[in-house]
């Protein structure tokens, strides 16, 4: 628990004591005390509505209760400078600021580990994300899915959870047959044959590149082979090449998976039959019109779902149910899927399946990723200028840089549509939040280099009590918030809060730096304190940037 958390906990304890001392409630009647941080600094450092919560028990007006609590509060023990009553009975606390200096020591001693905690208690969380069909390039929606999933995993890890990243390979459905036919057609075209693409073929540039690679490797070896033999080869070759390309693009995007799970393994190991047997034994299946159905309506779905079609083939739902059973059987405490917005309707049937299989449904969660709209020169970009197809992750990384793509794709909540302005993302100005944040880090690094060149000892002892300017105190409070912010982001699955935090801290840093002089030969003691503060801000920025997977440059 860091110094800010300790201060908050101490204040809660003293409020509790004041309630008892004022005889407003008994021990078992005191509700959980919730402290909020007012957006307006004029309302103090913390505020609580405890007086309103106690009105019925104490049989008094909330403002009178608030006055009673304020009069009985041990301000010294609570590190409170003053208390104000506002509105119908809110209590605003203005804290003594002397404790804030301890934040610097906390940050500098923890170094790269500052912000991390053990709050997750090693709980095992699996996050399955991206999982796009291996049939072409990764596009904008996949890229946002990748950024969100990866940063969510980083947040979980920083908050003390044991995290596993997984990619589910859809390698058993008809899309692999279409992939083989598509690669076959492109291969034959590359060697000069007049062949049309299959009706359901994949048109992307990635398939053309795979075919060119094969021609370079094998020449016309496959031109006269038996069609079935050739198609089997093209399916496997296309699958491996597509997965290799996807993995390469994701790795360059700084996203790496712990486990790549093959859908085919569910068929080979008999896991699908085992899953169907469990559903049948529970009385959750029935036959109608020659098909096998799942009674999902018993669990709140709007209609029952087909598991095995009349032709004997499985629906997409069946292996998906077996896959989720497999996940929970591996011992994860929680499984989280990151899906596109077109999968929203799939959630109720998967919840129904897990309930029917006997698993606690609260172990399963889905995060929906909304669309990305790309803009350039004020116009919406629908197609790539280079390929005439949808803009790929690879193109976007090459065009605007990995840092910018990752930052922007986790800058907003996953359930909000995202407008990505390519011109802004490439600009080196304070209007670009990525540049603005990274410049804050580089600015401190430059200042520290100047300090050394001017003869200041950047490792000198310092007196944090000299940091009394409002902008200094704002920085101290903000860097002290990092650990709890990470815990909250993990609890609420909101990695965009880390990006927001980075921007807010960078804003405070620039405001301070523009208003105050750090290196002052006439006030060496304060200079040493401010250097220490700048080092703590730099470390905090770097740690937060590591979580969202962007670089913290020393020069710009």
Swiss-Prot record:
<dbReference type="GO" id="GO:0004814">
    <property type="term" value="F:arginine-tRNA ligase activity"/>
</dbReference>
<dbReference type="Pfam" id="PF00750">
    <property type="entry name" value="tRNA-synt_1d"/>
</dbReference>
<dbReference type="InterPro" id="IPR035684">
    <property type="entry name" value="ArgRS_core"/>
</dbReference>
<keyword id="KW-0067">ATP-binding</keyword>
<dbReference type="Pfam" id="PF03485">
    <property type="entry name" value="Arg_tRNA_synt_N"/>
</dbReference>
<dbReference type="InterPro" id="IPR001278">
    <property type="entry name" value="Arg-tRNA-ligase"/>
</dbReference>
<comment type="subunit">
    <text>Monomer.</text>
</comment>
<dbReference type="GO" id="GO:0006420">
    <property type="term" value="P:arginyl-tRNA aminoacylation"/>
</dbReference>
<keyword id="KW-0436">Ligase</keyword>
<dbReference type="InterPro" id="IPR009080">
    <property type="entry name" value="tRNAsynth_Ia_anticodon-bd"/>
</dbReference>
<protein>
    <recommendedName>
        <fullName>Arginine--tRNA ligase</fullName>
        <ecNumber>6.1.1.19</ecNumber>
    </recommendedName>
</protein>
<dbReference type="InterPro" id="IPR001412">
    <property type="entry name" value="aa-tRNA-synth_I_CS"/>
</dbReference>
<dbReference type="Pfam" id="PF05746">
    <property type="entry name" value="DALR_1"/>
</dbReference>
<keyword id="KW-0547">Nucleotide-binding</keyword>
<comment type="similarity">
    <text>Belongs to the class-I aminoacyl-tRNA synthetase family.</text>
</comment>
<dbReference type="InterPro" id="IPR036695">
    <property type="entry name" value="Arg-tRNA-synth_N_sf"/>
</dbReference>
<dbReference type="GO" id="GO:0005737">
    <property type="term" value="C:cytoplasm"/>
</dbReference>
<keyword id="KW-0030">Aminoacyl-tRNA synthetase</keyword>
<keyword id="KW-0648">Protein biosynthesis</keyword>
<dbReference type="InterPro" id="IPR008909">
    <property type="entry name" value="DALR_anticod-bd"/>
</dbReference>
<keyword id="KW-0963">Cytoplasm</keyword>
<dbReference type="InterPro" id="IPR014729">
    <property type="entry name" value="Rossmann-like_a/b/a_fold"/>
</dbReference>
<dbReference type="GO" id="GO:0005524">
    <property type="term" value="F:ATP binding"/>
</dbReference>
<dbReference type="InterPro" id="IPR005148">
    <property type="entry name" value="Arg-tRNA-synth_N"/>
</dbReference>
<feature type="short sequence motif" description="'HIGH' region">
    <location>
        <begin position="132"/>
        <end position="142"/>
    </location>
</feature>
């Amino acid at each position: 628990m860091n110094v800010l958390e300790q201060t908050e906990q101490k204040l809660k304890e003293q409020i509790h004591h004041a309630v008892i001392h004022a005889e407003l409630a008994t021990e078992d009647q005191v509700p959980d005390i919730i402290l909020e941080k007012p957006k307006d600094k004029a309302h103090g450092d913390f505020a609580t509505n405890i007086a309103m919560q106690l009105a019925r028990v104490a049989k008094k007006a909330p403002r009178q209760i608030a006055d009673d609590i304020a009069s009985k509060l041990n301000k010294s023990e609570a590190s409170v400078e003053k208390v104000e009553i506002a509105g119908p009975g809110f209590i605003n606390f203005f804290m003594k600021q002397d404790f804030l200096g301890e934040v610097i020591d906390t940050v500098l001693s923890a170094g790269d580990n500052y912000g991390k905690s053990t709050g997750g208690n090693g709980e095992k969380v699996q996050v399955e994300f991206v999982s796009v069909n291996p049939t072409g390039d990764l596009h904008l929606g996949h890229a946002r899915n990748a950024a969100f999933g990866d940063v969510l995993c980083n947040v979980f890890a920083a908050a003390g959870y044991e995290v596993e990243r997984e990619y589910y390979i859809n390698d058993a459905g008809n899309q692999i047959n279409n992939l083989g036919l598509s690669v076959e057609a492109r291969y034959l075209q590359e060697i000069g044959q007049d062949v049309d693409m299959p009706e359901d073929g994949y048109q992307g540039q990635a398939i053309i590149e795979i075919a060119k690679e094969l021609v370079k490797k094998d020449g016309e070896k496959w031109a006269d082979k038996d069609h079935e033999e050739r198609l089997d080869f093209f399916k496997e070759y296309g699958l491996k090449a597509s997965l290799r390309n996807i993995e390469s693009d994701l790795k360059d995007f700084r996203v790496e998976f712990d486990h790549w799970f093959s859908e085919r393994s569910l068929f080979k190991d008999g896991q699908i039959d085992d899953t169907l047997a469990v559903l049948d034994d529970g009385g959750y299946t029935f036959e109608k019109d020659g098909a096998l159905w799942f009674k999902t309506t018993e669990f709140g779905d709007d209609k029952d779902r087909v598991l095995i079609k009349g032709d004997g083939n499985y629906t997409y739902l069946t292996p998906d149910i077996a896959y989720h059973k497999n996940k929970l059987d591996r011992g994860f405490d929680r499984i989280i899927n990151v899906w596109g917005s077109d999968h929203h309707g799939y959630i109720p049937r998967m919840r129904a399946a897990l309930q029917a299989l006997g698993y606690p449904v609260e172990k399963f969660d889905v995060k929906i990723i909304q669309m990305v709209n790309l803009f350039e020169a004020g116009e919406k970009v629908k197609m790539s200028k280079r390929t005439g197809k949808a803009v790929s992750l690879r193109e976007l990384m090459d065009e605007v840089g990995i840092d910018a793509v990752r930052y922007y794709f986790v800058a907003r909540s996953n359930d909000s549509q995202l407008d990505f302005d390519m011109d802004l993302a490439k600009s080196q100005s304070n209007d670009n939040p990525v540049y603005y944040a990274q410049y804050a880090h580089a600015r401190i690094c430059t200042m520290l280099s100047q300090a050394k060149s001017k003869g200041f000892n950047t490792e000198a002892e310092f007196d944090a009590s000299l940091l009394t300017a409002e902008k200094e105190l704002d920085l101290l409070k903000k860097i002290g918030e990092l650990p709890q912010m990470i815990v909250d982001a993990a609890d609420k699955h909101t990695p965009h809060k880390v990006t927001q935090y980075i921007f807010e801290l960078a804003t405070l840093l620039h405001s301070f730096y523009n208003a105050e002089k750090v290196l002052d030969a006439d006030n060496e003691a304060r200079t040493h304190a401010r250097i220490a503060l700048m080092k703590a801000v730099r470390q905090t920025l770097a740690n937060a940037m590591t979580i969202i997977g962007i670089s913290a440059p020393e020069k710009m």
